[in-house]
Amino acid sequence: MDFKIAVLAGDGIGPEISVQGVEVMSAVCEKFGHKVNYEYAICGADAIDKVGDPFPEETYRVCKNADAVLFSAVGDPKFDNDPTAKVRPEQGLLAMRKKLGLFANIRPVQTFKCLVHKSPLRAELVEGADFLCIRELTGGMYFGEKYQDNDKAYDTNMYTRPEIERILKVGFEYAMKRRKHLTVVDKANVLASSRLWRQIAQEMAPQYPEVTTDYMFVDNAAMKMIQEPKFFDVMVTENTFGDILTDEGSVISGSMGLLPSASTGESTPVFEPIHGSWPQAKGLNIANPLAQILSVAMLFEYFDCKAEGALIRKAVDASLDANVRTPEIQVEGGEKFGTKEVGAWIVDYIRKA
């Protein structure tokens, strides 16, 4: 198979972990006889500094013409600390999602047995937890009508039937591939938009008789995720709720540096780590590259290259078992490996496998 990959390294630690993802992908392609070409493009604060736009038209062209995007992270404190800034790095991420029609964000939440001690929750609660959070990406308050003056502000949480149906379809289809349990998360006791979500989910559920479908208010879901994370198989929800719940779910694993994600929809899919740009660690060779590397595994699996994805996951598991880890997940007294060293170890494992 031939792959054409757009690489958007972004800001902060993005360029460092991006390199590791690319090297892992190249090693896997070489091993399995695939051809891969990379085209690099700018985004986020880097793009604002260079051209004044966090997602320039040239970057959009590169993404649109690729088979997939390997994205890293955007964000810079100089924008976070300036409430008057008209252009922000994160707007580039929103623009990419909107222009590429990426309406579904898929985030796996799972624990690694050798790292359960890193979770803030008790080991017996989190060991074996394995579920998907599916978040709608292009509707709701983040994209609705907005207004702000000195005395009043509002954001509009609007959803249409087609937007809800297509993301629920993704949820049901993933549930069919897994343990056949779908939880629809809403706030139907208060919000009209949530009542429409629940109504449509109830209409669609009979089309998937093998799937057990339940409904949960978002506040209850937030508690359940901590109290009983193994309850969930596939969770689907709207944009704002999903943004919060997926970050909460990342805590279960013990490190945001372990979890990848995929954003899919009408055009080129995007694969990325769930963590941010961590600018304080830029250039220090301490960032965990595993989420970026596992994003590459998700990329291969998206294109039905299951053996390739499985090899990457096996290599990551082996690195953890061998205590080849960056500082935030290393055992006490263990050797602290850098970003480059972890990536190189995994590449070497893949080549020798």
Swiss-Prot record:
Cofactor(s) of this protein: Mg(2+); Mn(2+)
**Entry's Gene Ontology cellular component terms:** cytosol
Q: Which SUPFAM superfamilies match?
A: Isocitrate/Isopropylmalate dehydrogenase-like
Q: Gene3D superfamilies per the record? A: Isopropylmalate Dehydrogenase
Tell me a GO biological process for this protein: L-leucine biosynthetic process
Q: Which HAMAP family match?
A: LeuB_type1
- Protein name, per record: 3-isopropylmalate dehydrogenase
Organism (species): Bacteroides fragilis (strain YCH46)
